[in-house]
Structure formats: structure tokens, C-alpha cells
Amino acid sequence: MKNYNNYIFESLYPGIEKISSQQFTEYLNNLKDFKLTDKGLFRGVELDKNPFYIVNYTNRTRIIGSVLSLIMEFHKSWSEYPKRSKSIIFTNSLKSAKSYADVDDIMKNPMENLYRVIPFDDSKFGLAPDSNYKLCFSKCNEDFIHYQKLFYELVSLCDSKYDLFINPTWTTIKNGGIKIIKSNYTKLMNNIDKSLDYGRSKNKKSKLLRFNNADELIEYYFNPTDNGFKILNYKDLINNLTIKHEIWTDSPCLLARYDEL
């Protein structure tokens, strides 16, 4: 029978399972891609400070449903990338990794909340060109300073009878986010089309009106290759870690507390 404390833990953190030191060693000894001498991948976590975990978000279905999340989850240009809704997100920077966990805990016990991410063999990774993926959409930055301002401009073109954004309330976020479902993405794309059509019909002025439809707009501003994102295997990932990066994978992996290695 499963230990009661482990059952409670897995209920609070679905997809993350505590493992023993012996189990961790067995997993580690069977890995072919990973070596302890490799450049480190790190994440700060707010768990219960167990030294070792296994992470598998394959069955996870809940995530905060922002507009950018919908695009990266469902647009065809991102189809080969790991699904962020089912991914663990981490970095190659110790300093940046600390921001993933509670600041007070990190200041009190910096090593107890900092974990090394150890991927299983044959994993694939999404690599952002900087430490915060939201700041990496260069064409948005050139035209709008930030991707959110692009969507604010779309809202300014809207017919007020419909809502362009499909974002959760703060209460929803605290309760675990909302399901990202394809119908939300379809609604988003349809509403972008409506915004462009409505703006043209009212002779509004906007650089967005040069696009014929939502797909063309998304492809121009959010194509991963054009914005410096990469999809890599583990060996190529390690060789591409030149600065601070945000990284994600939907493949299973191990977490080992930094002071245990």
C-alpha cells in the first residue's frame, strides 16, 4: 500500500513522485545521455525538500491559459516542440533557477530549494534564446516593445461585442489554472480574424492590418525559428548553452537536490 504521506504529496503535486536515494542511483546508472560532469540544468522548487524526485507530466492537463500559451500549444509552427502544458521548465543559470521557488525559502535555505534537472535518454527540449521566453519575440519587440502590446492593439481594433482574450481570473490561477483546450485556441484565432476584418471595415490605422488573417499574423510574430528558439536533443542542448536560457521538456526527468550531488 502506498505510504499515506506520499499519497498526500502526489495529490498536491501531480506528476511529481518522491524517490529514494537507492532508486535515484539506479535511474542514474542506467542513463546513457547524461553525465554528472555536463553543464548543469537547474530549477528552484517549492516541494517538501526531499532529495530526489521523478517528474512525468504526461497526463497533466491543467495550465494557466494565456494567449501566448495557446499559440505555443496549438499553432502549427510550434507543433514539433515539447508541449509546455506538459513540461517541466528550467534553466542553465543557478541565479535564474532560484526565482522558480519561493524567495523567502531560497534566502533561508538556498540549497534545499535548488534542484538539478537530469533528463532521461532520448529527451527533446525547447530552448529559448534568453532566460525569459516571453521577452524573446524579437519582431513583437521591434513593432510593439512587448508581445502583450500587440494584443492590446488587436483589442483596439475589436468590435466590443466579443472578447479577444481568453485569460483566467486570479482566483482561477490560485486554484490551479484552467484547461488549455483546442476550442479556446480556435476561438482566439477566430477573434483575431474578426479584429482584423473589423479594423479594416472601420478604416482604422494599424500595422497589424497588413495581415490577411490570424494565421499569417501569428506566423510572422511568433514563429519559433524566426525568434531564435530551438528544438534540440540533449547533446545538442548542452552544446548550445552559451548564455542564460529558459528550457523546457515534456519528457520524464529526475530532480536531485543541488547539495546532494
Identify the residue ranges that each predicted region occupies.
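Active-site and NAD+-binding cores of ADP-ribose-processing enzymes
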Residues: 13-17, 21, 46, 118-261
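A short acidic (Asp/Glu
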Residues: 52-55, 99-102, 127-129
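Extended catalytic/binding region for NAD+/ADP-ribose chemistry, centered on the ART fold
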Residues: 79-101
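A structural signal for short, well-ordered beta-strand segments and their strand-loop junctions
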Residues: 41-43, 89-91, 116
